[in-house]
Swiss-Prot record:
Name of the molecule in the record: Short neurotoxin N1
Distribution of this protein across tissues and organs: Expressed by the venom gland.
Family, as annotated: Belongs to the three-finger toxin family. Short-chain subfamily. Type III alpha-neurotoxin sub-subfamily.
Species whose genome carries this gene: Pseudonaja textilis
UniProt KW Coiled coil keyword: no
Lineage: Eukaryota, Metazoa, Chordata, Craniata, Vertebrata
Protein function: Binds with high affinity to muscular (alpha-1/CHRNA1) and neuronal (alpha-7/CHRNA7) nicotinic acetylcholine receptor (nAChR) and hinders acetylcholine binding to the receptor, thereby impairing neuromuscular and neuronal transmission.
Coiled coil: none
Source organism superkingdom: Eukaryota
Alphabetized GO MF terms: acetylcholine receptor inhibitor activity; ion channel regulator activity; toxin activity
Alphabetical keyword list: Acetylcholine receptor inhibiting toxin, Ion channel impairing toxin, Neurotoxin, Postsynaptic neurotoxin, Secreted, Toxin
Ribonucleoprotein recorded as keyword: no
GO cellular component: extracellular region
């Protein structure tokens, strides 16, 4: 998963 500016996206 990717963490970007406090945003977590499960891909």
């Amino acid at each position: 998963l990717t963490c970007y500016k406090g945003y977590r996206d499960t891909v």
